[in-house]
Regions:
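Flexible helix-coil transition and linker loops at the boundaries of alpha-helical arrays
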Residues: 22-28, 64-93, 107-112, 124-137, ...
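Amphipathic alpha-helical repeat scaffolds of TPR domains
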Residues: 29-46, 58, 87-109, 123, ...
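Long amphipathic alpha-helical scaffold regions
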Residues: 167-209
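Extended alpha-helical scaffold segments
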Residues: 1-12, 24-27, 31-49, 54-67, ...
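Terminal, low-structured helical/coil segments at or just beyond the last alpha-helical repeat
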Residues: 197-236
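Eukaryote-biased recognition of C-terminal alpha-helical segments
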Residues: 134-151, 155-156, 162-164, 219-232
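Helix-turn-helix repeat elements of alpha-solenoid scaffolds
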Residues: 6-18, 52-79, 110-123, 150-158, ...
Length: 236
């Protein structure tokens, strides 16, 4: 079974809506249209028909972006939380945007022509919703790195991962992803492994005082057991 890294699922953010900030809710008709498109995409998504789900959901993402722009929303919660709820559907936006990220990555693994879309989505999310939950932002930064790696910009991918641990030094997932980049285990990254570099990164994460050290300790234990069959090491 593949150990390919999947983003940790996060709850919603706690964006603060200042006094006097009132956001107009969507009309029942608009709300229904967005919810209907979201549910339509879950049909292929649940059958692992990733590209088909993305074809339905990417236009929906653009529609949500218009709502986000027009109402000055800065974090995921701004759509669904508080007295002035903007959107309400069968599936929470907070869950759906993570499912779209998952669908895009899986579509790109199967068909690399999707990687530019993955890159666009991950960057757009962080630009438009910078006050979201920290784990959401870490996940999107890692997704951006995955996309850069997927289109052959490996050096930029690592720079993105390194910036992420600087910005989120206590995030075990930020450190884990950077170490995974070099581990050679089946986490979906390209390039030859440098297991000593991976080990050093995991250990730096532990020294930084990450919130859940077990994530990194498990990876260090895996490295200690030796490379997986077929792992290509970087020549010394």
């Amino acid at each position: 079974m593949s150990k390919r890294y999947r983003r940790a699922v996060a709850g919603c953010s706690n964006e603060r809506i200042g006094p006097g900030r009132v956001r107009e809710p969507l009309s029942p008709r608009e709300n229904h249209a967005l919810d209907h498109a979201m549910q339509n995409g879950y049909v292929p998504y649940q059958d692992d028909r990733w590209a088909e789900a993305c074809e339905i959901w990417l236009p929906l993402w653009e529609r949500f972006l218009e709502v986000i722009r027009s109402r000055g929303i800065r974090g995921v919660d701004g759509l669904e939380v508080g007295p002035d709820t903007v959107y309400s559907g069968l599936q929470a936006f907070c869950n759906w945007f993570q499912d779209l990220a998952d669908a895009l990555e899986n579509a790109a693994v199967k068909d690399p022509s999707w990687w530019p879309k993955v890159l666009e989505y991950s960057k757009e999310f962080r630009e438009r919703l910078p006050e979201s939950n920290g784990l959401h932002l870490v996940n999107m930064a890692v997704l951006e790195a995955r996309a850069l790696d997927g289109i052959g910009r490996r050096a930029e991918a690592e720079m993105t991962l390194e910036r992420t641990v600087v910005e989120y030094p206590t995030s075990e997932w930020a450190w884990a992803s950077w170490g995974d980049f070099w581990s050679g285990d089946d986490f979906g990254w390209s390039g030859a492994a440098d297991r000593e570099k991976a080990r050093a990164i995991y250990q730096r994460g532990l020294s930084a005082g990450v919130e859940d050290p077990d994530i990194l300790l498990e990876r260090l234990q895996s490295l200690a057991q030796g490379p997986e069959p077929g792992t290509q090491e970087t020549p010394e």
